[in-house]
From Swiss-Prot:
Organism lineage: Eukaryota, Fungi, Dikarya, Ascomycota, Pezizomycotina
Keywords, sorted A to Z: Copper, Electron transport, Magnesium, Membrane, Metal-binding, Mitochondrion, Mitochondrion inner membrane, Respiratory chain, Translocase, Transmembrane, Transmembrane helix, Transport
Catalytic reaction equation(s): 4 Fe(II)-[cytochrome c] + O2 + 8 H(+)(in) = 4 Fe(III)-[cytochrome c] + 2 H2O + 4 H(+)(out)
Naturally occurring in which organism (per UniProt): Trichophyton rubrum
PANTHER family: CYTOCHROME C OXIDASE SUBUNIT 2, CYTOCHROME C OXIDASE, SUBUNIT II
Protein name per its UniProtKB record: Cytochrome c oxidase subunit 2
A single cellular component GO annotation: mitochondrial inner membrane
InterPro entries: CcO_II (IPR045187), CcO_II-like_C (IPR002429), CcO_II_C (IPR034210), Copper_CuA (IPR001505), Cupredoxin (IPR008972), Cyt_c_oxidase_su2_TM_dom (IPR011759), Cyt_c_oxidase_su2_TM_sf (IPR036257)
Record topology, Mitochondrial matrix segments: 52-67
């Protein structure tokens, strides 16, 4: 089983576990390709121009050059083409992420100061009530060996792999944000409003996230732990 969590001095993405996060990472890499070319091209041109002026003996060698049609066309059209090449994949990914799928499982999550509560409206307990629970951070004094400080919770969200799952997010008091980087989720939680995000986990594993909206003094004490299991274990365990 995979364990995906932040690492000290981490500079790159966490391992993606959903198609939407794979799309985000691919878009990022494509944009970085264009930005790298732009960086080196502009740097080369600036250095070339500076060296040209430094090596020119006459300080008025370009006195009568007040415009250049060709270069103006180049620096107008080239950025426009680059922006189009960036925009189309970005819009495609944006609309794919917003596409409403018919989920096999719905989980309702509500942010509180400073914990999360979850409800599985598709399941009921012996009393006929919806399955629901609260998820609090595990205090540092209660951590077991091998668990993660400021990220472990007492009750994890369990979802099956290879299943379309919809998270419906809200808040009970102030604005929160339900975020799990490896799943490509960042869903704002507003009091009195419902927001949603769909996921499709490619593999089993444990994935860590946090509240990503400053919500008070214990904002950093609202971790999110999502554990993906097989469909059989989800229904029978």
């Amino acid at each position: 089983m995979n364990l995906v969590a932040p690492t000290p001095w981490g500079l790159f993405f966490q391992d993606s576990a959903t198609p939407q996060m794979e799309g985000i990472e691919e878009l990022h890499n494509n944009i970085m390709f264009y930005l790298t070319i732009i960086l080196f091209s502009v740097t080369w041109m600036m250095i070339t121009i500076i060296k040209s002026f430094v090596n020119t003996k006459s300080p008025i060698s370009h006195k009568y050059m007040n415009h250049g049609t060709l270069i103006e066309l180049i620096w107008t059209i080239t950025p426009a083409v680059i922006l189009i090449l960036i925009a189309f994949p970005s819009f495609k990914l944006l609309y794919l992420m917003d596409e409403v799928m018919d989920p096999s499982l719905v989980i309702y999550g509500e942010g509180h100061q400073w914990y999360w509560s979850y409800q599985y409206p598709d399941f009921t307990n012996a009393d006929g009530e919806f399955v629901e629970f609260d998820s609090y951070i595990v205090p540092e004094s209660d951590l077991e060996e091998g668990t993660l400080r400021m990220l472990e919770v007492d009750n994890r969200v369990i979802i099956p792999e290879l299943t379309h799952t919809r998270f419906v997010i809200s808040a009970a008091d102030v604005i929160h944000s339900f975020a799990c980087p490896s799943l490509g989720i960042k869903c704002d939680a507003y009091p009195g409003r419902l927001n949603q995000s769909s996921v499709y986990l490619n593999r089993q594993g444990t994935y860590f996230g946090q509240c990503s909206e400053i919500c008070g003094i214990l904002h950093s004490s609202m971790p999110i732990v999502i554990q993906s299991v097989s469909l059989k274990n989800f229904y029978y365990d």
